[in-house]
Structure formats: structure tokens, C-alpha cells
Amino acid sequence: MALQFQLNQTTPQTVTTDCVIVGIYADKTLSPTAKTLDAASGGRITALTARGDLTGKSGTSALLHDLNGVTAPRVLVVGLGEADKFGAGQYIKAVGNAVRALKDAPVTHALLTLSELPVKDRNAAWNIHQAVIAADHAAYRYTATLGTSRKKAEESGLITLAIHGQETSGLTLGQAIAEGVEYARALGNLPPNICTPAYLAETTAHFAATHPGATCEILDESNMEALGMGALLAVARGSANRPRLIVLKWNGGGDARPYVLVGKGITFDTGGVNLKTQGGIEEMKYDMCGGAAVIGTFVAAVKVRLPLNLIVIVPAVENAIDGNAYRPSDVITSMSGKTIEVGNTDAEGRLILCDALTYAERFKPEALIDVATLTGACMIALGRAATGLMTHHDDLANELLTAGEHVHDRAWRLPLWDEYQGLLDSTFADVYNIGGRWGGAITAGCFLSRFTEGQRWAHLDIAGSASNEGKRGMATGRPVGLLTQWLVDRC
């Protein structure tokens, strides 16, 4: 099911559409449009509520047919939960539930009126752009590698979702973020035999080539060797799929210093010599979701044509194993000149990132942010709801946390105290690539901080938030919303 969006201010009881979507709270209070349709139908919705057909419980919905006095042949009534607890999360959930409820209905046009609902600390523009993002997220279907018949069935159905309101800015931003999220999800969900470093580079280069104002430069192995990217190239040694460094540029801000995003692009992570085991390795195609997220953010920025300069850097590498693979106890030299003792080949993300972060310095960033599925420790600490945020800069932390709260793509700050740095000491090199059993997310951030000295830098660990767990889990596209909103706030 695919969606296209428009705004609509037509009178709901007479609008020409296949379905009008309204809401009901757990205390049986109807949304404004539900009240209008109830009155037009002679109290039919109230009657159904009284006999228990409509409960208002969050997660429920009921499709009503042929209400007297209502032109639309269907009215979808969505449960909103408790009115006094109806905030951003509940609103997003309600919109998603509405779209999923229409999946099997013969509907090609629907009017979503949930955007009229009051959401605490949010305005009309937010309601509209978040409705677009939530609806598009709920409608997403993975089809890239399905057989022909199943693919056709999954892709069938184009619904025009008319959102009640007039805030065109909200619609424009919502569509841009939704496209960026979908782009990131599509990349993240691809199998690793398709989404190799070369594929990732070719796909992003094609996007840049087809969007005026965007450019893409691809560095190959020889280019990286010339730059001295010994850490990145060490990780790449064991794979037949050779590495790429992807550099995307959007010049919307004249001579202003650029904002630079760096995303971890491990297209598959075996763990290397420290081989992963079943119960984790099968989800390691998602280890490039940091790269997918910053590419998705670039897509959103280009679509909305943000008036700033943006550079996105993705070190695209496969961490595999053969006779040439790097080993524990190896000492490698990074692009910065710092030497690194390898304690574990499965702590490879920080090795490719440290060279990419050093490379980013040449652009003199206004701010530098890296995004990575970096540590299982972050997922243990925060679960899947929150992205881990680490930075030495309180103002940057507040900017990112505020942006995340605004779009409900939230982060939680973890410390980068000096007390953790000693855990990375090495007898044989400048730094050890692991910090021991405790505080693994923080010591990974501390490792990266050693390669961002003098930069206004933050690290986002999306190990938990980048994908859903299990056989049916998929990439989420996070934190495209957070990053795009943060960039919008800089304009």
C-alpha cells in the first residue's frame, strides 16, 4: 500500500471520499468531526458507543458503513485512549492504527481528520507533518526481494490521504521526512548480498545525480590508502566486497560552514575473527543503518531544499573473514596518525568511523554528528525506544534532544566523563579499541571522542532504535526525523 498526501478543508459529512477517519477517547468523548458525523447520522455513532461497539481504547478501530446523512460510504472510528494522556506518542499511534486498518479495505481515497485533535505542546503544523510521517511509516511494505505474485499483492493499492487542515508547511516538511525515512528503511532492509558497499555507493550516487544541487563523490580503496585510512581498510581486508567512502554534498547555504553527518555503513558484520554466533549475526545486515539514516536525512534535506550546507559521509565496509582478515592484537594506524590496538574485531564500527571523522575535519564543520549501530551495550541500557546521545557540548546535546522530542524520535544523553577514558589505555598503541565489560556504549563514545578533538561533535548510538527485533523486524529509519528536524531548526 502506497500513500500520496494532500490537504482538505471540505465539510466532512458531505466530502466525496471513500472513508472519513475520526476518533473516540476512552471516556466515549468523540472527536470534533466524529461529533459532526454523529449529528448528521442522527446519533448513530453515539448509539454504537452506548452498546459497546466503540470503546475508544487505544489500538482499536471500527469501520462503519453507510451512515445516514454522511456522503462517504465508510467512517473509520479510531480509539484514542485516555484523553488526559493523549500526547505526541498517542497521536502518532492513532494515525498509524488508522492507516493499518485501511490496508484490506477497498479504499483509494480517505480523509484523515485526526489532525484536528489537540496534542499537548504541539501546533497545527506539527499535527499535519507528524500525521504524514506516521501514516507513511504504517503504510510501508518491504517488496524488494519478494516473488512476483506476492510483490504485486503487497504493492497494490494507492491511497490518497487527505489531511484535514491548511498548514502547507507542515505537509511539505512531513513529506520530506517521510521520504527520507522510507529511503533509509529501504536500504536497511535489503539483504547483504544485494546491499554491498558498491551497491550503497551506486544508489546514493544515482540519487545525487538526479537531484539538482546535490553531488556525490565516491572514494575507492586506492583513494583511502592514499589518505592513510588504515583503520577503515583493516576492517575491510577480510571481505571480497571492497570498501567505499561515500561523500554527499548539498550546497544550500552559500559560503556558510557545513553541517556534517557521518554514518556507519557496515553492510554486514560477521564479527571478523571474533565471529558472532546465531542469535545476533542474522540481524547484522542492519549494521549499516547509521549510514542509511544519514543518507535518508540527506534525501529529506534535498527534498525540502534546506537553506544550509550539508555533507554526509558514509564509510561503507563489510566486516568479513578470510586469511587476510585483521586480528585481535593487531596494531593499526588511523588516518589521524593515532595507533590502535585491536582488542576485538567485532568492535569494528568505531574503526571505520574514526577515519571517517578525521576525514570530515577537512570540511571545517559547523557541527559534526556521527550515527551508528555501535554497541549492544546501548541497547541493553536504553532498549529500543531511545537513541543514545553522547557529546561534550551541552548546547549541541540540548539541540538534538529538543529536535528529537519535537518529532517523537527521541534520544537520551549518556556521559562522556574522563573517568571512562582510562579503560581504553593500551600498552602497545595510543588507544585500545574496546573498554572492557562495563559501560560499553560510553567507552565506544569515548573512543570516537579521541578523533574529534576541536570539533563540535556528538555521537548517536542507534543500536536499539535502528531496527525492530526478531524474524519480522525491519529497519525503522531512525533517527532521520531527529536529524532532519535538527537541521530545520538551524535554518
From Swiss-Prot:
GO CC annotations on file: cytoplasm
Cofactor note: Binds 2 manganese ions per subunit.
GO terms of biological process kind: proteolysis
The keyword Manganese appears for this protein: yes
Keywords in alphabetical order: Aminopeptidase, Cytoplasm, Hydrolase, Manganese, Metal-binding, Protease
Keyword tRNA-binding applies: no
Compartments reported by the entry: Cytoplasm
Residues noted as binding Mn(2+) 2 in the record, renumbered to the chain: K264, D269, D287, E348
Reaction(s) catalysed by this chain's protein: Release of an N-terminal amino acid, Xaa-|-Yaa-, in which Xaa is preferably Leu, but may be other amino acids including Pro although not Arg or Lys, and Yaa may be Pro. Amino acid amides and methyl esters are also readily hydrolyzed, but rates on arylamides are exceedingly low; Release of an N-terminal amino acid, preferentially leucine, but not glutamic or aspartic acids
Cofactor field: Mn(2+)
E.C. no: 3.4.11.1, 3.4.11.10
Gene3D superfamilies: Leucine Aminopeptidase, subunit E, domain 1, Zn peptidases
Residue numbers binding Mn(2+) 1: D269, D346, E348
Record-linked SUPFAM superfamilies: Macro domain-like, Zn-dependent exopeptidases
Residues at the catalytic site: K276, R350
GO MF terms, alphabetically ordered: manganese ion binding; metalloaminopeptidase activity
PANTHER family: CYTOSOL AMINOPEPTIDASE, LEUCINE AMINOPEPTIDASE-RELATED
Family indicated by similarity: Belongs to the peptidase M17 family.
Task of the protein: Presumably involved in the processing and regular turnover of intracellular proteins. Catalyzes the removal of unsubstituted N-terminal amino acids from various peptides.
Name of the protein in its database record: Probable cytosol aminopeptidase
Taxonomic source organism: Xylella fastidiosa (strain Temecula1 / ATCC 700964)
